[in-house]
Regions:
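N-terminal Rossmann-like dinucleotide-binding module
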Residues: 1-49
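A contiguous active-site-proximal alpha/beta segment in oxidoreductase catalytic domains
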Residues: 2, 99-139
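Alpha-helical elements of Rossmann-like donor-binding domains used by nucleotide-donor carbohydrate transfer enzymes
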Residues: 18, 22, 44, 59, ...
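Alpha-helical structural signal in soluble globular domains
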Residues: 22-26, 45-48, 83-88, 107-115, ...
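Acidic-histidine catalytic/liganding microenvironments
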Residues: 26, 63-64, 128
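General small-molecule cofactor/ligand-binding pocket signal
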Residues: 32, 54, 120
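Short, Asp-centered acidic motifs that coordinate Mg2+ and/or phosphate
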Residues: 33, 68, 118
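Beta-loop-alpha module in the N-terminal Rossmann-like domain of NAD(P)-dependent dehydrogenases
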Residues: 38, 51-111
Length: 139
């Protein structure tokens, strides 16, 4: 079975830990490496989830063993990290919100389209049964 090899860019958002916890049990996923601009937080998370810690984001972004990246940094860093990740041909799951400005959203969209990589925002609550029912009632 082929495994999707995952890298994590920052553990600033708590959901990064949730993703890593869940993915450790997926037979078709391998957690490979992570980076965090807070090296203490990054090293602790890497150790907890069996990731290699890298003190440089580009070392994770350019790692040929990594297929996709989870970006869970502070929102003001999303556009820069996504441009670099997409440019390296990595598929991306980005923690919400996408960006702090419309200009950065446009940069992200352009980078992903230019690179032809898969991109998803982590808006998982759209599929929550209660939210779907509320939407149905409003429609």
């Amino acid at each position: 079975m082929d495994r999707v090899r995952i890298g994590v860019l920052s553990h600033a958002h708590g959901h990064a830990s949730t993703y890593c916890q869940a993915m450790r049990d997926f037979p078709d996923v391998k957690l490979v490496a992570s980076w965090d601009d807070d090296q203490t937080r990054g090293r602790q998370a890497a150790q907890a989830y069996g990731l290699e810690f890298r003190p440089d984001a580009d070392a994770v972004i350019k790692d040929p063993r990594i297929d996709a990246l989870i970006i869970a940094s502070e929102t003001n860093h999303h556009a820069d990290l996504i441009e670099r990740a997409a440019g390296a041909g990595k598929h991306i799951l980005c923690q919400k919100p996408m960006a702090t400005t419309l200009e950065d959203c446009d940069r992200i969209i352009a980078a992903v389209r230019r690179a032809g990589v898969k991109f998803s925002m982590a808006f998982q609550m759209r599929q929550d049964p209660v939210n779907r029912k509320m939407k149905q009632l409003l429609d």
